[in-house]
Amino acid sequence: MDRQDVISQLALRERINFEVKKAENSIPKSVWETYSAFANTIGGYILLGIAEKKEEEGDSPYLITGVNDPTKLKKEHFDSLNSDKVSTNILTDDDVEVIEYEEKLLVSIHVPQANYRQRPVYIKGNLNKGTYKRNHEGDYHCTEEEVKAMIRDSNDAGNDGVLIEHYDMEDIDMLTLRAFRNRFRSTNPEHLFNDYDDKEFLRNLGGYTKDRATGREGLTLAGLLMFGKGLAIRERFDNIRLDYLDQTNLQPGERWSDRLTYDGSWENNLYNFFTRVLARLVQDIRRPFVLKGYEREDDTPIHKAIREALTNLVIHADYMMTGVLRVEKHDDRFFFSNPGTLKLPIAEIYKGGNSKARNPHIQSMLRMLGYGDNIGSGFPTIVDACKKENWQKPLLCESNELHTVELTISMKSVIAEECIQHLRKILGEQVVRQLDSEEIFILSVAWMDGSVTNSVIQTLLDKNALQVGKLLYSL
């Protein structure tokens, strides 16, 4: 962080990834709450040496007080990080800098997002009362459920291999399992699993297990959710709903043109939901005539992208939380939402090369049918497909307040000519000429979507919070 970064950050005021503290002579206790909150959310910057003014004290909300001995503060900070004050130290020397600003010395602390194995990051040795998260510009205690979710996610083995006691083969919908096995046999005709009976087949897929310590056996979370009877699933997972809405070609007064949710006419397990929704999503996507050898190639990049998005929805959802797996089809976009938060940082997901499914057994089941992968190339597949169509970059967002992950695949052009015309109309030709391509892009997104945020622009332009802060400040 440099002087210009300080100017742009202060202009945008405190928010989800930026906090100021007075700290003239020592580290304030509240720094550790913010440290925990940033680490458990998306990371951020803490600036020491700046106090918040009362509203009546002038236009600027900040008073630059400076720190008297930055070297002492840095040592105090790292001594505390390496003590029992915090559960883990995720900072390096490069994360703490001294900055000169308005003839005062400030200390900048960059707190990165902790990786999923390190979370929850908590303070004072108190897991339940010392774990914080960041919402808007404040630090808040995590609820017991939020702490439990972070602990679950820290397990590399995932969540879906656990034995669900008192649920067995009687709770499997055999029509669903037969449909899966038929597709499996078609995709893998020589596979050894084809000769197994249903229980052994499920056991090898991770859908059935035995606790060797107790001798108890039964369905796993993956087995019940993927192939279970609807009633059995609703009895055990009444916290989860499945919902698909087609909102294309709506007439006045219509809320949807097609909907798939539980209505008693189908067994509402994940495999049935996945196959029914996928068919509806791609049914009217054009398939250009392309030959691969002597056969027609019907699998377009957009078909692959939609499959990947739906696969991600199912394998990354947190089925222990209360929420909805929601899929929406609109005239100009596809929308996917699932309960839970992201295990990996958003920037890392866009880059690809790393895959950490919350439900690896469900992921394996779908992959054996040709859906998705486990090498981290899935999301770049979605990005590349949109780029080939000249669509906007797909927007992946998470809400730590609502505990949801949302993906929007927009069919709008990157920057439509009507956006440029609108900007010329409201800003004037002269102003638009002075804007660079990134500034025009930000204003275009704001016009199309109604507003923009730092985190959204980070994703769309592949920039960090400080870089986007400078752009927003310039506008």
Feature roles, as predicted:
Residues 432-440:
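Short helix-coil-helix linker/hinge
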Residues 474-475:
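Alpha-helical DNA-recognition elements
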